[in-house]
Amino acid sequence: MPTLYTDIEIPQLKISLKQPLGLFINNEFCPSSDGKTIETVNPATGEPITSFQAANEKDVDKAVKAARAAFDNVWSKTSSEQRGIYLSNLLKLIEEEQDTLAALETLDAGKPYHSNAKGDLAQILQLTRYFAGSADKFDKGATIPLTFNKFAYTLKVPFGVVAQIVPWNYPLAMACWKLQGALAAGNTVIIKPAENTSLSLLYFATLIKKAGFPPGVVNIVPGYGSLVGQALASHMDIDKISFTGSTKVGGFVLEASGQSNLKDVTLECGGKSPALVFEDADLDKAIDWIAAGIFYNSGQNCTANSRVYVQSSIYDKFVEKFKETAKKEWDVAGKFDPFDEKCIVGPVISSTQYDRIKSYIERGKREEKLDMFQTSEFPIGGAKGYFIPPTIFTDVPQTSKLLQDEIFGPVVVVSKFTNYDDALKLANDTCYGLASAVFTKDVKKAHMFARDIKAGTVWINSSNDEDVTVPFGGFKMSGIGRELGQSGVDTYLQTKAVHINLSLDN
């Protein structure tokens, strides 16, 4: 019999836990049908943590059947009020286990515990509280008078069985963005965590069961995207799929969904988000926000302000201060334990990502011969894991691959603009449209930018401080649909129209 649990010790926090390693189907942990496993690695050390069961197409079928049976027989008949109660139960359990969940995110994803992972759990608590209160409020239809003898009304009904695929940069937070909204709307779920970062969601499954959710309502199938993700996207008995990840893979999900049963699709994909700094901006505050917006989470953020455009009159001053802030506040050298409060910039997720980001840095330095500043020498001496120092390229032309491609690491490009029209043209010159930021004291200019930028989120005099009550999603190749806020429930509901004829003659 395969091992379905292992003991994990985190001595820095004096935390011991029993870590599930199996697939979670029908409220039970079980082995994969072929017994294959995936090894997960601590990105701060490059050393293995453990191995967990890897799902395949047969396991996906099993999970879908469990979700369908749960929806048809139990969950579709459960009141919205009761769904909210289950989510409230879950909220209490997350509060009790938040330190353990944050510790698993640090261990498995390399997130600095004090500055990142605990913040993720704070957001998870906020959004679970929000969706618990939303379950019996956002599923209401409307009455529409038509004529003297006719009216119509609408019903908001769940899709049924929903598949969700979540990324490795915010493993548990992104899972909860999707999972809690789908459950509040009345769907059953099969969710696939990233193969790099499955531990926290598998542990979270124990809380799902303790909260009282009926068997089959939530099913977790860790595994490789090319196998499990493909099986979910192409499955004929899944009614909707929600994906967060790269634009390339999002295209595969959309294609597979269209070629199977035309299931509804929500995509949150890549970004190359611009931050614009006008000459009237509070420069120190703008720099603090922009530094956090690119270096937080080691730049592994789809909304990271990885392109910075600065008005030419203040460009040199901005660059000088930006480098000083990066060195003073975000340097990684000698701070290689993500459980230590001194560690602010953790490792990137894997050797593959490390090599990919390194190749962009080398291209900028050697092939494009760009001006470059790094907070530490690179590779970093003494680092065992996948640590990359914050890296700033300046005077970067619009044609540069570093400016056009999503690098997904602590690498930022800085360029200058002359006036508003120039800034807007540069900011919109991308295939992406996830987020943007503008720094100015001119209220008119700020609102003009919010109107004119082609992006799903606009921050004015801040960056990357989203709120769970506000819709989130992208324009252009950054995605389809919205999550969070009321949209976080609406995206998992369909509208049905009912026509009532009161005339006795017709």
Swiss-Prot record:
Induction: Expression is under the control of MSN2 and MSN4, and is induced during diauxic shift and osmotic stress. The record marks 169 as: Transition state stabilizer. Cytoplasmic aldehyde dehydrogenase involved in ethanol oxidation. Required for pantothenic acid production through the conversion of 3-aminopropanal to beta-alanine, an intermediate in pantothenic acid (vitamin B5) and coenzyme A (CoA) biosynthesis. GO terms for molecular function: 3-aminopropanal dehydrogenase (NAD+) activity; aldehyde dehydrogenase (NAD+) activity. It is found in: Cytoplasm. It comes from Saccharomyces cerevisiae (strain ATCC 204508 / S288c). It catalyses: an aldehyde + NAD(+) + H2O = a carboxylate + NADH + 2 H(+); 3-aminopropanal + NAD(+) + H2O = beta-alanine + NADH + 2 H(+). One of its GO terms (biological process) is beta-alanine biosynthetic process. Its main location: cytoplasm. Pfam families: Aldedh (PF00171). This is Aldehyde dehydrogenase [NAD(P)+] 1. It comes from the Eukaryota. Gene3D superfamilies: Aldehyde Dehydrogenase, Chain A, domain 1, Aldehyde Dehydrogenase, Chain A, domain 2. Keywords: Cytoplasm, NAD, Oxidoreductase, Pantothenate biosynthesis. PROSITE patterns: ALDEHYDE_DEHYDR_CYS (PS00070), ALDEHYDE_DEHYDR_GLU (PS00687). Its EC number is 1.2.1.3. The active site is at residues 268, 302. GO terms for cellular component: cytoplasm. Belongs to the aldehyde dehydrogenase family. Present with 2070 molecules/cell in log phase SD medium. SUPFAM superfamilies: ALDH-like.
